[in-house]
């Protein structure tokens, strides 16, 4: 094969005229010519991002035109996802910078909350209105963008909402003292890399049950980070977490599949140019992956009890450098309680 100037060699408007404005047929004609001109025969692998229905229609028609070429694809781990599974030290440094900036934003949100007055059990804005989840999320987005990052969304969920792992938070809910808040933020820096971290906070004070659950999560979190090393099966860390929580009497996805209570998800996932990449810290069947140099993964044990009105999670993103050394890319303290001075 040889590189070509697509616009000079393949006039897209000419294909549209030839196909009387039918964009699907024009695309098929164009790709057929590319395959012919590049003399691509045999098995031809297809990769990329495309609407599933559109891809099916396109590739079915294209295959019918290619007598000497078989179009093939991969499901699950593909050539490109495998290549992206490990990062070199330069990429890890880019991701360390993403972690540093994310920590700065999280610190600014902490200070934003702490800077508000308290009326009864609620936070109050300068205009006298109650501070809401929506206000906090708007401030968070503004700081993400101010530091040159982008995000599609983040989780800032309080009380019962925090007890549902992927609940993003109810925008009009007032910020109240003594309720658990799960703040899960995963912005993307200009170089394209994501960072993923979660902190659990309580404004003013933490109720006993929230504190106990948080301490349990932090205990297993610390053990995991102390034990994780290159060469170990990724599934072992999820098994270790399940064993720990089950021994404390919590339901888990292993003992109570489908339960909304207890520890209900896997331990973590790869992070990189996508927020969810390989490897997976999961006991799912077929997961035989070993931790390798270059792996970057989230570690995020959590406990969730929506009917009791709380959830807690601790999450950092860690990387294994080319020499096998683990480095924590998340740079922010783990304090549970945000002190709220009375004004």
Where are these regions (language model features)?
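Active-site neighborhoods and metal-handling regions in enzymes and metal-associated proteins
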Residues: 1-343
């Amino acid at each position: 094969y040889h590189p070509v100037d697509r616009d000079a060699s393949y006039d897209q408007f000419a294909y549209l005229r030839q196909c009387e404005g039918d964009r699907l047929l024009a695309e098929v004609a164009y790709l057929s010519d590319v395959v012919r001109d590049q003399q691509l025969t045999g098995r031809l692998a297809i990769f990329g991002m495309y609407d599933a229905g559109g891809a099916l229609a396109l590739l079915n028609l294209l295959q019918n035109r290619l007598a000497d070429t078989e179009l093939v694809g991969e499901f699950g781990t593909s050539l490109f996802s495998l290549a992206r599974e490990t990062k070199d030290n330069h990429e890890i440094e880019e991701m360390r910078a993403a972690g540093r900036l994310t920590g700065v934003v999280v610190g600014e949100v902490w200070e934003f909350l702490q800077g508000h007055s308290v009326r009864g059990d609620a936070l109050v804005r300068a205009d006298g209105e109650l501070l809401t989840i929506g206000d906090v999320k708007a401030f968070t987005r503004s700081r993400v963008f101010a530091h040159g990052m982008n995000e599609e969304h983040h989780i800032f969920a309080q009380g019962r909402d925090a007890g549902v792992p992927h609940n993003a938070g109810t925008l009009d809910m007032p910020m109240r003292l003594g309720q658990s808040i799960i703040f899960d933020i995963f912005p993307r820096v200009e170089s394209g890399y994501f960072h993923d971290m979660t902190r659990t906070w309580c404004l003013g004070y933490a109720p006993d049950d929230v504190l106990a659950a948080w301490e349990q999560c932090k205990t297993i979190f610390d053990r995991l980070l102390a034990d994780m090393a290159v060469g170990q099966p990724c599934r072992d860390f999820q098994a270790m977490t399940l064993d720990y929580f089950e021994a404390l009497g919590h339901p888990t996805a292993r003992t109570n599949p489908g339960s909304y209570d207890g520890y209900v998800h896997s331990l973590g996932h790869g992070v990189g140019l996508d927020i969810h990449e390989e490897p997976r810290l999961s006991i799912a069947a077929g997961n035989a992956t070993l931790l390798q140099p270059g792996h970057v993964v989230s570690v995020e044990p959590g406990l969730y009890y929506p009917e009791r009105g709380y959830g807690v999670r601790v999450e950092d993103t860690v990387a294994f450098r080319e020499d096998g050394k683990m480095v924590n890319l998340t740079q922010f303290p783990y304090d549970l309680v945000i002190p709220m001075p009375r004004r």
